[in-house]
Amino acid sequence: MNKGSRDNNHSDRGISVVLAGGGTAGHVEPAMAVADALRALDPDVRITALGTQRGLETRLVPQRGYDLELITPVPLPRKPSKDLLRLPMRVRTAIRQTRDVLTGVNADVVVGFGGYVALPAYLAARGGLTGRRKVPVVVHEANARAGLANRVGARSARRVLSAVPDSGLRNVEVVGVPVRESITSLDRAALRAQARAEFGFAEDARVLLVFGGSQGAQSINRAVSAAAKDLAAAGISVLHAHGPKNTLDLPPADPQAPPYVAVPYLDRMDLAYAAADLAICRSGAMTVAEVTAVGLPAIYVPLPIGNGEQRLNALPVVDAGGGLLVDDADLSGDTVARTVIPLLTDDSKLAAMTAAASLSGHPDAARRVAQVALEIARAARKKAS
């Protein structure tokens, strides 16, 4: 078959989008939110997720009904090691595998979300399909400080999208972090009574939601459980997702006190958000995006590792009045009690924080990223025809 006939067949098929966002939930969830938005905008779109065998995408992508193609992982060592010596070979292998995927699905555009899946995708797209055209790239950076993969991808990308204006990338368009539609469409007030009944709280309760990501956060767990008596004495109920591998040291339950509901994991974050008046959580990009999308004020406790991006992720919300920052090193039972109780017992202050949190969110981020991807893909097809 000659090149011209291949291109004609290509133009008759739905737009082919490859999403490169494997590894952690912070990369996979935005990719899946964009996939859902793409399908809503164009039911004929063909979506392929790129991932590795070791990432969460092996479970999350099939659950959401999308095709998944696996490549060799290319983790980038932070320090000199044997892995650094193996890096060039791994990169070449991953690029070759990715180019095969892009060719196999006849990709029209690659949308990358950073991490060790995105880097080979950017390089393969720039090199072009086997014997054919280059593939345009759209980069999305969720963190306030861009990682290596997105810094590389942004150099040749058609469009660079970001959660914040100062992520370290040039010529960015601020769109926020893509969040799944079940969260962005959540009406907390309408669902509150059902949500509180689900967890055993009174309809008029003051509810603190505590979570530290899918695996929990031990420092948050220790501090909030140490404040349990003070919170109960102030009439505050607690919904605490402590992580499947963690336990809490709680005082004996008092049937006369507001309930302290401790669970390993929350399958229904929508109900948890609807039940809550205030949250204590980490400040990963995805967490901040979800919490602000639903308009929930929060006390953010940045993870004290990495390059400080979690603190930067929360700063815009905190500066706008939608949250507070507490350093992990300063977290204790006393800190929790002194911070939470004045907030949850002051209606006007809580209402102001709730309003500010709502204004800080970007509930249309997934749709905006999807629109850009389709625009770039259609322009590339038109140019090639």
From Swiss-Prot:
Source domain of life: Bacteria
Binding residues annotated for UDP-N-acetyl-alpha-D-glucosamine, in chain numbering: 24-26, 143, 180, 214, 310
Originating gene: murG
EC code(s) of this entry: 2.4.1.227
UniProt record similarity statement: Belongs to the glycosyltransferase 28 family. MurG subfamily.
Reaction(s) catalysed (UniProt annotation): di-trans,octa-cis-undecaprenyl diphospho-N-acetyl-alpha-D-muramoyl-L-alanyl-D-glutamyl-meso-2,6-diaminopimeloyl-D-alanyl-D-alanine + UDP-N-acetyl-alpha-D-glucosamine = di-trans,octa-cis-undecaprenyl diphospho-[N-acetyl-alpha-D-glucosaminyl-(1->4)]-N-acetyl-alpha-D-muramoyl-L-alanyl-D-glutamyl-meso-2,6-diaminopimeloyl-D-alanyl-D-alanine + UDP + H(+)
Functional summary from the UniProt entry: Cell wall formation. Catalyzes the transfer of a GlcNAc subunit on undecaprenyl-pyrophosphoryl-MurNAc-pentapeptide (lipid intermediate I) to form undecaprenyl-pyrophosphoryl-MurNAc-(pentapeptide)GlcNAc (lipid intermediate II).
Keywords (A to Z) from UniProt: Cell cycle, Cell division, Cell membrane, Cell shape, Cell wall biogenesis/degradation, Glycosyltransferase, Membrane, Peptidoglycan synthesis, Transferase
Name of the protein: UDP-N-acetylglucosamine--N-acetylmuramyl-(pentapeptide) pyrophosphoryl-undecaprenol N-acetylglucosamine transferase
Pathway: Cell wall biogenesis; peptidoglycan biosynthesis
Cross-referenced Gene3D superfamilies: Glycogen Phosphorylase B
Membrane topology type: Peripheral membrane protein
A single cellular component GO annotation: plasma membrane
Single Gene Ontology BP annotation: lipid glycosylation
